[in-house]
Amino acid sequence: MSTTTPPPAKGGKDKKGAKAGVKKGKTGGSGQSKKAGLTFPVGRTGSLLRAGRYAKRVGKGAPVYLAAVLEYLSAELLELAGNASRDNKKKRITPRFLTLAVRNDEELNKLLSGVTIASGGVLPNIQQVLLKKKGK
C-alpha cells in the first residue's frame, strides 16, 4: 500500500498553490506590444516615460512610437554589427564590431557622434602624408 497522495481534482490546487493542469509562465495575453506587433515592451516604455518626468502627461501613442523606434534602431545596429563580425569570420558580436558598424554607417555615425563605445577602439586610418611615396 502506497502513501502517495492522489493528483488534485480538476480545477483544484496542488501543493505549491498553483492550479492543477495550468502551465506556469507566459499566457500569451494581448499586451500592448503584441497589439502593436512589436518585440520591445510598450508598457515598460510607457512606465519609464512617466517615471522620468519628461512631461506632465504622456499620450497613449507615445510609448508605442518610442518602442517602435528603439526596436528599429537596435535591429539596424545588430544587423550591421553582425555583418561586421561575419566579415571578420567571428561568430560573436563584440563592442569592436558595434563601433565598426556605427562608424562605417553615415547616418548612425551622425546620430551617435557623441557616443563612446567602451572597448570599441577606433577605425583604422593612416593619413596620406605618412605613407611612403612610390616615385622615390
Swiss-Prot record:
GO cellular component: nucleosome; nucleus
Start and end residues of each stretch annotated as Disordered: 1-38
Keyword field contains Nucleus: yes
Keywords: Chromosome, DNA-binding, Nucleosome core, Nucleus
Function recorded in the entry: Core component of nucleosome. Nucleosomes wrap and compact DNA into chromatin, limiting DNA accessibility to the cellular machineries which require DNA as a template. Histones thereby play a central role in transcription regulation, DNA repair, DNA replication and chromosomal stability. DNA accessibility is regulated via a complex set of post-translational modifications of histones, also called histone code, and nucleosome remodeling.
Native organism: Euglena gracilis
Name of this chain's protein: Histone H2A
Signal peptide positions (record): none
